Amino acid sequence: MPAAHSESMNKTKIAKIAFPIAALLCFFPFVSSAAALVLGIVLAVALGNPYVDKTRSYTHHLLSLSVIGLGAGMDLMVVGRVGLQGIGYTVVGISFTLLLGMLIGRMLKIERDTSTLITVGTAICGGSAIAAVAPTIRAKSHEVSVALGTVFMLNACALVIFPWIGHLLNLTQTQFGLWSALAIHDTSSVVGSTLQYGPESLQVGTTVKLARALWIVPVTFLIGLFYFRGQKVEGGAGKAKKPWFILGFLIAAALVTWIPELRPVGHVVETVAKRALVVTLFLIGANLTKETLKSVGIKPFLQGVGLWIVVASCTLGAILIGWIH
């Protein structure tokens, strides 16, 4: 048996043991959000991920359950107020990001579908938006992989960079929560980033991000109409995947708000949900395998980075001068 093949088999065996143990460790409070993400990336790059399909599926389901659990620790009245306040700048932000993203994609001569997926992932809520729009525009599997790989890498960067910038600029918890919700791609990374910054930041960031995620459905519908205008497409323009976990979040918040006796239980559920989110971040890191990193070409990555920098900078500037508050 060749030495290289033997070494590969040994790595796979070690990885099959190491990944479940690492995921279990992330449930404990001594593992931070950033540490969990880094641990997942290191294991994936060093050993490879023998559970790629499972970790992607678990990431989606665990994130949904965790977000619902976070609702059990929040006041519905506060959630409603914060969500309604964010409608105006959410509409402006999504529209601006979609237009700028498509412009950058054309300038860099990136495949139309890949550019659309990266843009919509940046504009709304990362991987969830990409997963919803991909079947609508009939995107090929490699185009979806490139878009997801780009977004996942930027999510990982955000978990480290955003809290550091927040502390450097002495942002308030509300300011940081708003900035994270409007400038970080995925809900999981928004929660991971704001979780490091403070409880008020977590509440604001989660609420505004979930309100933003609701735009998956209308934006996906409009993209479908734009792509196939003038064409008769069998089965329609595709169906958007509805973010049902947002409804679960609102129901959980309503229960603890309207039934005070449930609040002690709600706090326990919220605590467990926060730890589950740390595990989710580990799984996100575990999805950044060598294959994923190689699949992202330089042009799509430049589009993702350039668009993200502009969106994050403009949003931060608007928050600092008081346009967004």
Swiss-Prot record:
A Pfam family reported for this protein in Swiss-Prot or TrEMBL: Cons_hypoth698
The Gene Ontology CC terms held by the record are: plasma membrane
The record describes its membrane topology as: Multi-pass membrane protein
TM region positions = 21-43, 58-80, 87-105, 115-137, 144-166, 211-230, 243-260, 302-324
Q: Does the keyword Lyase apply?
A: no
Q: Which domain of life is it from?
A: Bacteria
Name the family the entry cites.
Belongs to the UPF0324 family.
State the protein's name.
UPF0324 membrane protein Bd1437
